[in-house]
Regions:
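A ligand-binding cleft/hinge motif common to bilobed small-molecule-binding domains
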Residues: 94-104, 161, 165-170, 197-231, ...
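Short beta-strand->loop
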Residues: 108-118, 154, 174-179, 196-197, ...
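An extracytoplasmic/periplasmic, membrane-proximal ligand-sensing/linker region
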Residues: 26-28, 169-170, 235-236, 258-319
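Short, low-complexity disordered leader/linker segments with a strong preference
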Residues: 1-26, 319
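Hinge/capping helix and adjacent helix->loop/strand transition within the periplasmic-binding protein
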Residues: 79-85, 100-185, 234, 247-280
Length: 319
C-alpha cells in the first residue's frame, strides 16, 4: 500500500507544472510572428529565434501568422498553452497601436501577455520627393502652414499615422493622411511626386535615400543615425519632445510560470551579449533593446499612454 501511495504521489508531482519546468525546455519551441515572411520584422524574429535556440539547446521554429493587423498571430499565442513553448514576436503596432485603432480587439496586450525582453528598435524618417523644395523640417512646417489645403502625407500603418498626428500636434499643422497597404506603393508615389511627403522606417528607405530617389527630411531618433550623419533629428530641429521608434519584443502568455519566464529572459540576455547580435543590428540598422521583463513592461505601458494621448488629441477612435 505504501509503495502504491508513494508511486501515485510521485506521478502527481511529475505531472505538476513545477516539476515539469525543471527541464525546460525539453522540446523545440515555436515563435509566432504576426506578420508575413520577408518583412523586416520577420528577419528580426528569425535571427533571434536562431540565436535563442542556440542558447537554450532547443530549436525555436518560426511560424508566420499574418493577417488582420497582427490579430491572427496574437490570438495564436493567446490560445496556446501557457508553458513557455510558444513565443510571441510582439511589436509596437500589435502591443500599443491596435488597442487604440481596432474596435473590439480580442486580446489585451497587458493582461494576456507578459514580456520577456525588448528585442530591437529602429528610427523612422520623414521623406519627400527628390525634387521637392522642402530641404529640412523648418521648410516642411512652413510649407504645411502656407499650403491652402492640407498636404498629402503617405503612411502604411496606423502606427505611422499616429506618428504623424503627434508631430502635427506639436507643430500646429494639419495634413491629409493617404493610407497605403504597403511601403512599396507609397515609395512609388513619393518618388513620382504624387505625395508631398511620407513617413517610413529608416531601414526600408535607406537605399532610396542613398541613391537620391527620395529626399530625407529628418529622423525620429534621439540622436542622428551614424550611417546618415547629415540627416538631422526631429528632436534637434525644434521639437525636443519628439522621439519615436518602431520596436519589437518577445512575450509569452501572461500566466506562463515565472521560472520559465526567467529562464527565457536569462537566455535572451546571453543572446544580446553575442557578437553575432551586434553584427546583425548593425546590418539591420536597428538598436538592441536588452530590457529585463520589468523594464519592458514599464516601457510598453508608457508607450500605450503616450500614443493614447496622441490618438485622443487627433480624435482617432477604434473602428
Amino acid at each position: 500500500m505504501r509503495t502504491w501511495i508513494a508511486a501515485a504521489a510521485f506521478a502527481a508531482l511529475a505531472a505538476s507544472p513545477a516539476f515539469a519546468q525543471g527541464t525546460f525546455p525539453d522540446k523545440p519551441l515555436r515563435m509566432i510572428i504576426p506578420f508575413g515572411a520577408g518583412s523586416g520584422v520577420d528577419a528580426n524574429g528569425r535571427f533571434f529565434a536562431e540565436q535563442l535556440g542556440g542558447v537554450l539547446g532547443q530549436a525555436v521554429v518560426v511560424e508566420n501568422k499574418p493577417g488582420a493587423d497582427g490579430v491572427i498571430g496574437m490570438m495564436a499565442v493567446k490560445t496556446a498553452p501557457a508553458d513557455g513553448y510558444t513565443l510571441l514576436l510582439a511589436s509596437n503596432s500589435s502591443m500599443t497601436v491596435n488597442p487604440l485603432t481596432i474596435k473590439d480587439l480580442p486580446y489585451d496586450p497587458l493582461k494576456d501577455f507578459k514580456p520577456i525582453s525588448g528585442l530591437t528598435r529602429g528610427m523612422t524618417v520623414f521623406i519627400a520627393p527628390p525634387d521637392s523644395k522642402i530641404n529640412n523640417l523648418a521648410d516642411l512646417v512652413a510649407a504645411m502652414k502656407k499650403s491652402p489645403a492640407p498636404m498629402n502625407v503617405g503612411t502604411y500603418s496606423s502606427g505611422y499615422r499616429l506618428a504623424i498626428e503627434w508631430f502635427a500636434d506639436l507643430a500646429g499643422v494639419k495634413f491629409t493622411n493617404v493610407p497605403y497597404k504597403g511601403a512599396s506603393a507609397m515609395f512609388t508615389d513619393v518618388i513620382g511626386g504624387r505625395l508631398d511627403w511620407a513617413v517610413t522606417d529608416l531601414v526600408g528607405a535607406a537605399e532610396l535615400i542613398r541613391t537620391g530617389k527620395v529626399k530625407p527630411i529628418a529622423v525620429s531618433g534621439d540622436v542622428r543615425y551614424p550611417e546618415f550623419p547629415n540627416i538631422p533629428t526631429i528632436k534637434e530641429s525644434g521639437y525636443p519632445a519628439y522621439v519615436n521608434y518602431t520596436w519589437s519584443s518577445l512575450s509569452v502568455r501572461a500566466d506562463t510560470p515565472p521560472d520559465v519566464t526567467a529562464k527565457l529572459a536569462d537566455a535572451l540576455q546571453k543572446v544580446f551579449k553575442q557578437q553575432a547580435t551586434a553584427d546583425f543590428t548593425k546590418r539591420a540598422k536597428v538598436e538592441m533593446m536588452a530590457f529585463t521583463p520589468a523594464e519592458m513592461d514599464k516601457f510598453q505601458r508608457a508607450e500605450i499612454e503616450r500614443l493614447k494621448k496622441t490618438a485622443d488629441a487627433a480624435g482617432i477612435k477604434p473602428e
